[in-house]
Amino acid sequence: MKKFRWAILLAVLVACLLLWMQTLNVMCDQDVQFFSGICTINKFIPW
């Protein structure tokens, strides 16, 4: 039962990470000044 709980936790974390990446991509496309530094780093990480 404990393994099942860990699997759910991991799935939620992965989903949140994917959502965050989508949000970053949208912000980068709109060229928001605050996100420009993050976008530069984001380009070097192969998502």
UniProtKB/Swiss-Prot annotation:
Q: What cellular-component terms does GO give this entry?
A: plasma membrane
Q: Which keywords, in A-to-Z order, does the entry hold?
A: Cell inner membrane, Cell membrane, Membrane, Transmembrane, Transmembrane helix
Q: Can you tell me which family this protein belongs to?
A: Belongs to the MgrB family.
Q: Which superkingdom heads the taxonomic lineage of this protein's source?
A: Bacteria
Organism encoding this protein: Cronobacter sakazakii (strain ATCC BAA-894) (Enterobacter sakazakii)
Q: Where are the transmembrane segments?
A: 6-26
Annotated function: PhoP-regulated transcription is redox-sensitive, being activated when the periplasm becomes more reducing. MgrB acts between DsbA/DsbB and PhoP/PhoQ in this pathway. Represses PhoP/PhoQ signaling, possibly by binding to the periplasmic domain of PhoQ, altering its activity and that of downstream effector PhoP.
UniProt xrefs under InterPro entries: MgrB
This chain belongs to which protein, by name? PhoP/PhoQ regulator MgrB
Please give the subunit comment from the record: May form homooligomers. Probably interacts with the periplasmic domain of PhoQ.
State the compartments where it is located: Cell inner membrane
